[in-house]
Amino acid sequence: MKKFKRRLSLTLRGSQTIDESLSELAEQMTIEESSSKDNEPIVKNGRPPTSHSMHSFLHQYTGSFKKPPLRRPHSVIGGSLGSFMAMPRNGSRLDIVHENLKMGSDGESDQASGTSSDEVQSPTGVCLRNRIHRRISMEDLNKRLSLPADIRIPDGYLEKLQISSPPFDQPMSRRSRRASLSEIGFGKMETYIKLEKLGEGTYATVYKGRSKLTENLVALKEIRLEHEEGAPCTAIREVSLLKDLKHANIVTLHDIVHTDKSLTLVFEYLDKDLKQYMDDCGSIMSMHNVKLFLYQILRGLAYCHRRKVLHRDLKPQNLLINERGELKLADFGLARAKSVPTKTYSNEVVTLWYRPPDVLLGSSEYSTQIDMWGVGCIFFEMASGRPLFPGSTVEDELHLIFRLLGTPSQETWPGVSSNDEFKNYNFPKYKPQPLINHAPRLDSEGIELITKFLQYESKKRAPAEEAMKHVYFRSLGPRIHALPESVSIFSLKEIQLQKDPGFRNSSYPETGVFVINHFTCRS
């Protein structure tokens, strides 16, 4: 052992001490929490921690070098330390040079956690080839943290990041990302300025606000938390779904601020909803604009339905529109992720005028086609300027539906004759009326499409994905179907809003509309 200790001490002598080598290692590891105190040195006085054996200490810093050590007979020194002493040496240093390794020490490849860097150093001073970091730019940071392009970073943040951050080509842990976002200002109420109150509902109050990070307007949906009940289930649903829905035709959830008393959802701010847009047009919209809005509704729904998410509360008040004409689905408070097989859901889910007849008659098992009936009703309303089925009660709503589309029979709607609620109402035997008589501005292709939505049997309703390919949209051109999900249809030069014939204002007003708990709030 004396001979071994002497050889070990000679090996550890170099231009750098163990503390210096480990400090270099620490500089390249990901900082987990930006607000945490400085890490204590791993090694004190050049000795390994007493809780670890010499073998485990050496193995910690040499075991992941990827170059297997040469083996000597165990009788020379001993099996536990032979692998270390047998490694080739150049003078007093280990002859090891790190490449930009792609395999982490935990056995994972590029997906290795950002909390433990692959740039592991030997306790003896080892010069790394990639020690020098290139300067971090705003573009790097935006890409790294998925930030908005117009964000304003706090003064000095980039300089601090330059000193403390690991190389940007390494993976980043969720914990590190949260810490970085928090330091920038996300998740903090002081980042947002309340400008005015837009409205108040049962659980939430909505404010028009401004972000200090981007100087953009935002909608602050402040949900009150009751200590006895916690967050309303509608709020939990909305957050859990929206955080995973990233699409050009779905309202963007920018941030979540959680305090003891409230949960604030920070949304992008849009100027108005479809209901007010139609009101401003005097209920006479350009048929070209009707087509553009309908396509965007279908595009957003198709994205949701591919992910087994049902909106369940489609109505003009839940469709927000900005000055450019971009339409976005909003208010996912009643939305629900649909599992397979289909589960039973609440019977009270959709605003009465846009509720499909199967739900009105008590059906509680449904699929993505539940949303398509509402699409047909909204399509008609945009084209004609009036609601299709403005019933005041469930019976009145069904009466209006049957009077236009004909009272269903066992032939037109299998199973309806055995429905108890249908039998109890005892509706007159209405014959179907031609839809063109009620929506004369729709061409034959539009009538064909709306008929595909207004089917009694839910499984016969045209899915959103299929409807987008209908010949009715042929005039929009082929390129609109190839757009990435996050890209607006208005990025195409051939796609533009036209002036609506009945539009009463010469300029687009800033009205500030946002929807909470089925209550439309306007500034």
From Swiss-Prot:
The active site is at D313 (proton acceptor). Residues 31-55, 103-123 are annotated as: Disordered. Brain specific. Within the brain it is concentrated in the neuronal layers of the hippocampus and olfactory bulb, which mostly consist of post-mitotic neurons. Residues 192-473 form the Protein kinase domain. InterPro entries: CDK, Kinase-like_dom_sf, Prot_kinase_dom, Protein_kinase_ATP_BS, Ser/Thr_kinase_AS. Its EC number is 2.7.11.22. Keywords: ATP-binding, Kinase, Nucleotide-binding, Phosphoprotein, Serine/threonine-protein kinase, Transferase. Residues 110-123 have a biased composition (Polar residues). One of its GO terms (molecular function) is protein serine kinase activity. Found in a complex containing CABLES1, CDK16 and TDRD7. Interacts with TDRD7. PANTHER family: CELL DIVISION PROTEIN KINASE, CYCLIN-DEPENDENT KINASE 17. Belongs to the protein kinase superfamily. CMGC Ser/Thr protein kinase family. CDC2/CDKX subfamily. This is Cyclin-dependent kinase 17.
